[in-house]
Swiss-Prot record:
Positions annotated to bind substrate: 8-11
Phosphoprotein keyword on record: no
Protein family (similarity comment): Belongs to the gamma-glutamylcyclotransferase family.
GO cellular component, one term: cytosol
Single GO term (MF): gamma-glutamylaminecyclotransferase activity
Organism: Vibrio cholerae serotype O1 (strain ATCC 39315 / El Tor Inaba N16961)
EC numbers on record: 2.3.2.-
Record: active site: 73 (proton acceptor)
Name under which the protein is recorded: Putative gamma-glutamylcyclotransferase VC_2546
Domain of life (superkingdom): Bacteria
């Protein structure tokens, strides 16, 4: 079975964990509706509900890759999977759950443009 996944941080092209998606198909860039907030947690970002648009990419992944992403994202402890509507269809999105660690908002909503 194939799944769509929206990625917004270290899984994006050129970022440190992109190798997890090396055999997956990039469907395109996507900017969410202003329903989220993106925080810099140091080595990676955390996305939570908010009032900001977040930039990312949508990939077509297989079951094995999705399972590997769940392990990487520490589902269901650190992140949980939810769905988001994209121009490519309904995609999985990883929502950060450890809100006590949120301190540094990424104003641009783009992990790749953080300062």
């Amino acid at each position: 079975m194939q799944h769509l996944v929206f990625v917004y941080g270290t899984l994006r092209h050129g970022e440190s964990n992109h190798t997890y998606l090396q055999h997956s198909q990039l469907l395109g860039q996507f900017e969410t509706k202003p329903e989220y907030a993106l925080y810099d947690l140091g080595a990676y970002p955390g996305l939570v509900e908010g009032h900001q648009s977040v930039h990312g990419e949508v990939y077509l992944v297989d079951e094995h890759t999705l399972a590997q992403l769940d392990i990487l994202e520490d589902v269901p402890v650190e992140y949980r999977r939810d769905t988001i509507e994209t121009p490519f269809g309904t995609a999985w999105i990883y929502i950060y759950q450890e809100t006590h660690r949120l301190h540094s908002l990424i104003d641009s909503g783009d992990w790749c443009q953080r300062v």
